[in-house]
Amino acid sequence: MNVRMLSANAVFLMLPALLAACSDAPRPPAVSFRIQNVPPVPRTMSQMSREVHINRDFMSPRSRARRAAHSMHPRFITIHSTANPKGDAAAHARALKRGAMGSLNWHFTVDQYRAVQHIPLNETGRHADRGGPGDMSSIGIEMGEVRSHNPVVTWNRSAKLTAVLMKQYHIPLRNVVPHYYWTGKNCPAPLLTNGRPGHKWSWFISRVDYYRRCLETRPAAAV
């Protein structure tokens, strides 16, 4: 999602239409990737959450975007990139809280150092497809593109966060999708190839899979 060119126009839908859209999410295609040839290091959910360094900085429930929200049990995780070379996670949190994004919002912004949570996970955001199934059924994660940050560190932190959310909500790896999946948009641009999922997206999914396996691996029993 390009946060420098955000529309403030809201689309208001009746509840039956929203519920219908929620059930109409198509099944994503399977992503082919090479499994990381590294033994998974066992982590608990709390350990990996600490590694992600999640900070809550919620928008006001009275904000324009949150007033239009609906309750949600997430079935997808949608990955975006900010297309903002200057704004880190804290800057995006401030922008959301002062209403600079209009009717748009999402659940997390991730940068090199932290992941900032903007809204509750049981609440819809407006980040994927203007009130369609992507908004109604997915957690939105924006990956920062700060010029002075190491992008690989940001991507790995995002992969860890994704793995934690997958386990928390029993979301299959197949349902971790780029913004491109919902609208064909070139987003997250740094992880797409010629505007489409390719080898870079497969690499990211392999990292998510690795951290997922870390959460599912039991520590070796003491001898």
Model-derived regions: residue spans:
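Solvent-exposed, acidic/flexible segments
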Residues: H70-M72, M101, G132-G134, R147-S158
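N-terminal secretory signal peptides that target proteins for export/translocation
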Residues: M1-R4
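N-terminal catalytic cores of peptidoglycan-degrading enzymes
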Residues: C22-R130
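Second-shell loop/turn segments in exported
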Residues: A65-R66, N105, E142-V152
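Glycine-rich, often proline-containing surface loops adjacent to acidic residues and nearby aromatics
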Residues: D135-M143
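Basic/polar, cationic surfaces and motifs that engage anionic cell-wall
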Residues: C22-I54, R147-V223
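A cross-domain feature marking catalytic cores of carbohydrate-active enzymes
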Residues: S81, V110, M143, P178-Y180
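Bacterial N-terminal signal peptides
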Residues: N9-L18
